[in-house]
Design a protein with these regions (language model features):
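Active-site-adjacent structural elements that line small-molecule/cofactor binding pockets in enzymes
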Residues: 1-215
Length: 215
C-alpha cells in the first residue's frame, strides 16, 4: 500500500512507522494518567507487548520493508517475529532507493533502531518533551551514529508541537527555539476546534520563515 501510495503521490510519500505502543511504565499525566496504548490496543484486540519485544519487532519490520522496496527478486526472511517466503513488492515505490523512513521514538533502544534504519527521526515536543529533552536525545542519537559508523547528518530531526490559536507568538517562539536546538523539521499539529488554516501560514509560518535564518 505504501509503495502504491508513493506512485499515486508522484514520489511524495514519507513513510512513518514506530513501535505503536507497549506495556511501558512512565509518566502519562498528559494522557489522563494512563498509558494510551492500553485502550487503543484493547479496542482492536491486539496484544500489547513488552517494550523490548515491540522494539525488536520494529527493527525486523524496517529490515523487511526496505528489502521489499529495493530488491528485485523474491526473498525469504526468517526472523523472531516475522517469517516470509518468496516476499516481493511490486510495483516498487517511485522514490529511489525508497521513500524516506520516519521513525518516531526517543527511548534508548528505539534510538538504536532509528540510527540503523531511519531517514527522519521524530519525537513529540512540549508539553510532552522539552527542548532540553530533545538536546539530550539528539546527543544520544549522535553517539549511536558514531558507534555504528553512520553520519548523523543523514538523519533529519523532526519534532511535532501543538499550535496555539490563541497565542501564535508562543508557537513561533517555541518553533524558533527548537530550530536553534537543531530541529530541521517542525510539524505543526492543529487542535480542535479547528478553524480555516490560512491563519497558520499568515501568523506562524511566514513570520517564522522571515525571522529564522535558513541554510
Amino acid at each position: 500500500m505504501a509503495a502504491t501510495t508513493d506512485l499515486i503521490a508522484h514520489g511524495r510519500l514519507i513513510f512513518g512507522i514506530g513501535v505503536g505502543g507497549t506495556r511501558v511504565r512512565g509518566d502519562f499525566r498528559h494522557w489522563g494518567g494512563q498509558n494510551p496504548a492500553i485502550r487503543e490496543f484493547e479496542a482492536y484486540g491486539v496484544p500489547l507487548v513488552a517494550p523490548v519485544e515491540g522494539i525488536a519487532a520494529l527493527a525486523e519490520s524496517c529490515t523487511i520493508i526496505r528489502r521489499m522496496w529495493t530488491e528485485a527478486s523474491p526473498f525469504d526472511f526468517d526472523g523472531r517475529f516475522y517469517q516470509l517466503k518468496g516476499a516481493i513488492c511490486e510495483p516498487k515505490p517511485r522514490q529511489r532507493p525508497h521513500p524516506p523512513i520516519l521513525i518516531g521514538g526517543y527511548g534508548e533502544r528505539t534510538l538504536r533502531v532509528i540510527t540503523e534504519h531511519a531517514d527522519i527521526w521524530n519525537i513529540p515536543g512540549p508539553p510532552f518533551l522539552s527542548v532540553e529533552d530533545f538536546r539530550r536525545k539528539r546527543a544520544v542519537l549522535d553517539e549511536h551514529c558514531a558507534a555504528m559508523g553512520r553520519d548523523p547528518g543523514e538523519i533529519t530531526r523532526s519534532v511535532q508541537i501543538f499550535l496555539s490559536g490563541d497565542d501564535p507568538a508562543a508557537t513561533r517562539a517555541l518553533a524558533a527555539e527548537l530550530i536553534d536546538a537543531g530541529v530541521q523539521q517542525v510539524i505543526l499539529a492543529l487542535q480542535p476546534p479547528v478553524r480555516p488554516a490560512q491563519w497558520v501560514a499568515d501568523e506562524v509560518i511566514e513570520p517564522l520563515r522571515a525571522a529564522v535564518p535558513t541554510g
